[in-house]
Amino acid sequence: MSVPRVGVLALQGDTREHLAALRECGAEPMTVRRRDELDAVDALVIPGGESTTMSHLLLDLDLLGPLRARLADGLPAYGSCAGMILLASEILDAGAAGRQALPLRAMNMTVRRNAFGSQVDSFEGDIEFAGLDDPVRAVFIRAPWVERVGDGVQVLARAAGHIVAVRQGAVLATAFHPEMTGDRRIHQLFVDIVTSAA
């Protein structure tokens, strides 16, 4: 694969920022809102947003089943914040009955929604990230954390003693928003994963 076509799930969140970051890292980015667009990509970014709303938009657009199937077939994916929540196999504090975040089950992990607190508890800080020489500036907004990782999941970063970045095969997830800082190393890591998986 010379230039990977990487979709950004364009339901909520920093779609434009992810598209720009992917372009800067040598990918061919495109938005994904429909089944034919999902079928056309080599990989997918699931941005932040509100995980319960995103789940139900996926249902309404008839994308939840097809996305689960593509992920089960090995589609490389990167989820930031709400994207991390959705990629999990289990979600704690998933939301009110009938309006819960629905796991895509792409990673063998349990994630707790809004674990770091509400909007007013949002913060940023420098964190060590496995494989990167210098710390990453991480922006946490109503962020989740990973409560448990299972077999095959590599922990890449922690903040305040909690797991905030993980990888399982060609699937990457962060509790923070690298698209907001101008530091492209996380997106470059994902593009490299996509290229290697081809």
From Swiss-Prot:
Active site (catalytic residues): C81, H177, E179
Pathway recorded for this protein: Cofactor biosynthesis; pyridoxal 5'-phosphate biosynthesis
Annotated catalysed reactions: aldehydo-D-ribose 5-phosphate + D-glyceraldehyde 3-phosphate + L-glutamine = pyridoxal 5'-phosphate + L-glutamate + phosphate + 3 H2O + H(+); L-glutamine + H2O = L-glutamate + NH4(+)
Keyword Membrane: no
GO MF terms held by the record: amine-lyase activity; glutaminase activity; pyridoxal 5'-phosphate synthase (glutamine hydrolysing) activity
SUPFAM superfamilies (UniProt xref): Class I glutamine amidotransferase-like (SSF52317)
Keywords: Glutamine amidotransferase, Hydrolase, Lyase, Pyridoxal phosphate
UniProt binding sites for L-glutamine: G49, E50, S51, R113, I141, R142
Any one of the GO BP annotations: pyridoxine metabolic process
Annotated function: Catalyzes the hydrolysis of glutamine to glutamate and ammonia as part of the biosynthesis of pyridoxal 5'-phosphate. The resulting ammonia molecule is channeled to the active site of PdxS.
Alphabetized PANTHER family for the sequence: PYRIDOXAL 5'-PHOSPHATE SYNTHASE SUBUNIT SNO, PYRIDOXAL 5'-PHOSPHATE SYNTHASE SUBUNIT SNO1-RELATED
Family: Belongs to the glutaminase PdxT/SNO family.
HAMAP family associated with the record: PdxT
Name of the featured protein: Pyridoxal 5'-phosphate synthase subunit PdxT
